[in-house]
Structures are given as C-alpha cells and as structure tokens.
C-alpha cells in the first residue's frame, strides 16, 4: 500500500493513541492507529533497577554526557573537562514511569516516535501490510511502525478536501451575544477530493417576515438537514436546521477547515448556539470510533509572552480528534506579517491588488481593465479569481461598488460606481485592491428584507472565499508540510509551538547522530548582554546615492566561525581590574593559541568586573554550528531544487522548505540567549553579538574612505582578520570602466548592514559599481564563511535617527531607477498610534524633501528654512480654518487591565465611558480617542496634563462647543519633522515660537 502522510494526531482520552491520516494512490483516506508511548532515556544501571518491564527498549550505545554549565573563573588555571561516557537506553511505555535519573527529558514524545521509527512526518511510504491489522474500513492498527514504514518512496500528489466558511450574526450593539442573537448566515466554500467546488450560503429564514418569504420564488427552502442541496447558491431554513447542517459539515473528516478568526468567534459561536437551542453538541470521533469528544475551543494564555498593551498572548485551539486540521488565518497572519491592521479588509487589500486602465462607462460609471499588459504576469489572473465573488473595490482609498464585471482567464473588466469617489482620467493606470465590503451590517439588520438577506449573503460568501484565496496566497498548505518535516512534528502542531520547542526535533536528531547528551544543573540565571552595533547616522539628508550591503546570515555564520556552542566553551575568565585583565589575556593567548581556539572579549556580566573573556575550542565542530550548517546546507539544497523545479507544485514545496530552514537557522541565536531554551548558553549568545559587532566594525573600517580611481579600488585600510590577523591587499584591480571615479563614505550601520554614500546620483552607474564591490568584498576583504550581499541603492535617503529612515529603494536586481519603491522603516507611517493627519503631513514633507534632494539646487540650510516656513504656515492655516474632519485626528489603543497602577488614566477614561454608555468597551477591544478642548481656548504654547483632554470617540460623538486640541498633534508632528532636518538652531527657534519649549532631538 502506497500512502502520503497528511496529518498525525493524538486521541487524549483514557486510552491514548496516535493516529496517522493519509491518502493512497487512489486518493482514498487511510487512517493508521499506533500505540501511544512515553519515552525515557536512562543509564543502563537505572534501566536494570526498574520494577516495571517497559513495553519497548532500545540501546542507544555509548554516549558522551556533557555538562554545559558555564565554568567562570578569575584566573587562567582552566581545568580540562572530560565528559562522562555511558551506555544509555531508550525505553518506552504506554503509561508514565517514575524515573529517578532521566536524561533528555526536554524532548517531545512524538519526536522520539518519528526518529526511532525513521518516519518523515510528511513523507510518502510503501507500507508493509504484514504489520497492519484492519480495525474497520479505512482504519488499521500498526504493531511495528519501524518495519511497516521501512520503505520511503518518491513523493506523489494527492488532492485534499477543504471547508472555508464565514458567519454573520444578528446584532443590535457592537457585538452579538450568543444567548440572544441568532446566526443569520453561514457561507461555505467546500472542495471535495475530486476538486469539485461548492459555494453556498444558508440564510436563517426566521429573521424574515412571511411576506418576504413569499417573494423567495425559486430560492430553495428546506425544513430538515436531509433536504440540503449543496449545489444551491442560497438556501433558506430555520436557525436550528442551519446549525445542524453546520454540525454535519464540521463533523466530516475534511483535511482542512479554514476560517478567519474562527477559533475565537465563529466556531465557538456556532457550537454554543447549537447547544443552547437543541442541547446537541458537535462531536468528533477518532477514526476507529473508540472515542468521541465534544467540540471545545480552549485558550492558551502565556503571560510570559505579553503582546501589545501588556496583554497576555492568547491562542485558541480546537480539540478535535478526527484528523481534520482546523486553521485560523487571523492567528497565522498576525504572527507572521507586520501590518497596520489585521482586519480581513486590510489583509485582503495587502494581498490582492492589480493595476488597471480606466475608461468611461454608462451613467457616470467607469470601467477598469486589467491584464498581463497592465501589471506583472499573473496579477490579473489572481485578481480575477478574487473578483468573482467581490462586491466592492478599493481605489485611491475610496471603496467603490461593483456595478458589473467580466472575468476571463488572464483579464478582467470591472465597472465601478465612482460617483462618491473621484473622476478617473481616461487611459490612466490605477491600482485596484480588495477590501471588506462597504456595508453597514447594523443598518441592514434593522431593515432585514429578502433583498437585504441576499446582499448580505453575497458579502458573507465573499469573506468565505477570501479565506480560500488567502490560504493559497500565503502558501500555507506547503508551509505546514515543510514545518512538519523540518521540526519533526505532526502537521497539526507545526505552527502551535514557539521557536524554543520547534528547535527540539532537529536538535534531538543531531544529538542522537553525534552520540551526545547535554545536561545542565538547576534554573539558569537571567543575565543581560549587549546586542548588535548600531552606528549613529552621520547626517539627516542625502542627495547622493547610498549603497546598502548586508551580511548573509551574520549570526549563524558567527556561530559557525567561532564554533560557539555550550559544550565547546572551555571557560569564561573574568577580571576585576586592568592589571589582572592584562595578565590574564596574555597568558590565555599562550595557553589557547589561535586558530585552534578563539578568545572572545565581551562586556562584563556585573558592575564589579571590568572584563570577560570567553574561550571556545574550534578543533571539533560543536552542536550549534553543526545544527546551523545542517540548516544552511538544506536551505541551499532546496533553493537549488526550487530553481530547477519544472511544475508549480514542486516550486511551492521547495520554496516553503527553504523558507522554513531560513527561519529556524535565524532563530538559533535568540535561543542561545533564552534561558528556558534547551540551547541556552549565555557565553555563546554574548560572544555571538561581540563577534558580530567586530565584523560590522571591520567592514566599516575597510570601506569608509575607500576610493575608485582608474579601474582600481583603494580600500580605506588593509583587510585584516580582526581575530587572527593577516594582511590583504589595499589596492585591488576591478573590471569597472576606468573613467568612473567614485568615493565611498560609511554613513550608517545597523547590526549586519552598512550604508555607503557615494559621490554620484547616477543610479545605473551606482548599481554596476555596487555589484563589483560585492565581489571584491567577498573574495578579498572577508574570510572563512562570512559573505555580504549588495541589497539595494537608496536614493534621496532621509535618516530620522537610528533605525528610522525613509527612502526610494532600487533593488540590487534592477537596471535603473524606474523600479524605485518608497519605503519607510520605523517611522510614523508604519505605526498604529499615529493620527491620519500626522501620517498625511509627514508623507507630504518627506515627498517635498525627497524632491528637493533630487533637484540638488538648495543648500541644507535653505532646505531647512523652506521646510520650517512651510510647516508653520500649514499648521497655522489648519488651526485657523479647521478644515480637516475629526477622523483625521483619531488615535487608537487596546483596552486592557495590565496597568501597574490602579488609577491609570487610560483605565479611568474607559471606565467613565462605560458608565455613561450602553455599549461598553470590552477588555481586548481597540477604541478610538482624540484630544479635545473648549472651542474658545486660544492657541496653547504650554501643554500640560494632556491626558485630561482625551475623549473616547464613537459613532455618536460630536464636537459640541469644543475643538480638536490641535497643539498636541502639531507638536508631535513638528517633533518628527525637525528630526528630518540638519539645522538644530532653526528648528529650536520654530519650536520655541510655537510651543514655548525646545524640541526633543532623537539620539
């Protein structure tokens, strides 16, 4: 029997069992049951003392037991540490055992199962059916996984089954109550194993009057679940019938059930509503039908991982035991994407967009045509697929209703109602994007007619189908399989854990291969250490081009180069005075000669010390470097396979695999400094950042002041290994046109990147020189496994401060400046706690400054003068005219209760609002507020107690006898703008004039 593994899952009842859900070559589902065991690693003596004979035992052979506790001393009398060598056994038993001296207890039972049986979680196998016993049709018991799964075979594709759904509930207030508000709609997109797609919406007819139902005509109305026709677009039935159909669907063994925030709302709401109305439950059964559990969505609160606003990180999980993988897109995207908003409309707008050409249509409407000539190949095709159920389109921040649409394989024509938006220019190109349909549900429920119900059904179905497109857009299916294979975990757990748990699978595999056991004593003490080096920007505005060079995987390569690992750490020598330090360092260099050892000077761990030197043995590759090399080699392998892949399925899989190895490799450094991690090594973590700082400083010293003259590159200093010495050539021949002359100045650096300003505005020339410079740095300046990559040319760079800048980015693969994209890093444009007015103004002034820099006519002082004059005029004009609406000044924050003080003003503000309003703001909810003061209040130079001017803004809020407290907003805006300018004197003068105080200049 040939199978492809789809998901591994456990039943956690009285008799625990492990199950595999798979497909055979006929695309039929196959379930295999295994005995669930607890795994223990013990010494042979401990095994012999057990009073219970374990169900399974296997000798792991002689293994080195290495104590990785750090040995910190104040002199150079470093003692040689000899690891213990002992014969170890792996034992397994269906019930927990009491073991007095257990080793490797931190690893998961499921990981042991995969490794000892040589099973790849997402693999394809030719099963030996001699070890399978039929339980019931399609379900078997396996009594020997190792022999049954002995023959892996090349991967083959099978089709999967999916259910994407969304619900709407009647409500009067902000949120529906499960006790009083019925479900009005459920829309489903259901794909069976033959790839047939069903799209339908079930509407609660009890919300419609009999008069409205009489208008239903050909719309299917049913009374029982058995009457349901999944080919019908819309079905009318009672709420109980609707919920029972949902129960039937959720109890089916789909491969994936995908929702958007369904774990926290939709699924819980449907389940609870069903129980309230019928006393029935959604039940999941194991494939052997031996265990049934009621659907339950349980919460996992991690107070140790607090999110924005100090709220504990909460995740939601469905307790099913039937092999279906329930997936919440909201939780996944929130964890993996950095977006301004995680509402479905914002995510859809970010994911699905296409450039199109405008032309007039009837009745003042406009048609937009998109195809492979208006945007990149494939964009129109994807947009067309989403457009099939789309009802509204976003264009230039205006949401427009779709009047009609024509969809072709690689082209779309969509007519939009532009009356309340703007008048497009004929034959001009506009970017269309999707967002949430522009409808007011509360208004629709107030006048709930059949027409309204159908309109809402279209809206609901679009959201369900959006889930399908987002699932494909993010390539989640292949990422799940890739994560399962990489982390040696079941598919259903691949995204459940944090990096500290995900690393355990690959680490255990390596430890078994190298016959190594790492042990440490007691709880680890938390100690601080310095991070990466960030250079201060040399100036604010750049008229010349700036080259950006990044180290490839700096920290992983630092660990490999230094052989940083807890078991390769010889010792840490600390000194309390300068004389002691000099003597110790001199003796250490003699005792531990390079390159067999590396001495890493780090910042001291306490104030009573002046130095700390970590000594690492480089003679035999350590566990962490081996782990990293394995990850990087496999990533390179899959990147190569990705380039050679001929079909889209293979490309998606290889791309997901290389991505997973990139993520896990980059997580290792963080885990070395995380004391709860199995890889925790304080000395290794701080040595990693110390070497990293040396590498960025070294690159800066070689490039800052370099010159290109007559085809030769003259470096600023001799390329010298900062750890082991050795000089390289300072003058290097290049293949660059000898007529090109260029000077290089380092103007900023951050951890693993260097910003090099060149005395040229020519983008094409800068690109050519940068690519040649990349080759020279990698072949002559850098050494061993260190490499840099030319990332981009930045044009019209504006540096606000460290880690905050705006620029036009021309990627390394570009040929000229035509592909330039504006980016903002760490600035207010990317933040959620900044008003629209602030964002619009800062965008205006950055564009203005960028244009001025491009022109290159004005001096820095004149740029500053013109900018400050314009700013003062704009602010005073807005203050006098008050033209911008209140919504431009709204701010938002999350309501929570994790404040240190009981009388926190944010809490008091919400409590006051809740006491005066029926619709209370709940814990975890975001609310809008603004700064408001009496209308008669003149311009305020001195701003004090600004928290007292905060007012929560809801739909009913109006400025009655009040005005926006502009001065607060203007001061924040002016602070950011003066930090874009180089002249502190002029900036201070304006600030003192407007606000009676000096500005805060960013460090």
Model-derived features: where do they sit?
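DnaQ-like (DEDDh/DEDDy) 3′-5′ exonuclease domain used for proofreading
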Residues: 1-253, 279, 395-398, 461-462, ...
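Conserved DEDDh/DEDDy metal-dependent 3′-5′ exonuclease domain
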Residues: 45-53, 59-100, 211-340, 346, ...
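Intrinsically disordered, low-complexity acidic Ser/Thr-rich regulatory segments
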Residues: 225-236, 305-322, 384-385, 396-397, ...
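Common nucleic-acid-contacting/processivity interface regions adjacent to the catalytic cores
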Residues: 359-389, 397-399, 417, 424-435, ...
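Short beta-strand
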Residues: 404-405, 745-750, 790
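Non-transmembrane amphipathic alpha-helical segments
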Residues: 628-645, 661
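C-terminal, non-catalytic extensions of nucleic-acid polymerases
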Residues: 721, 729, 771-774, 778-1003
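Catalytic palm subdomain of template-directed nucleic-acid polymerases
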Residues: 754-771
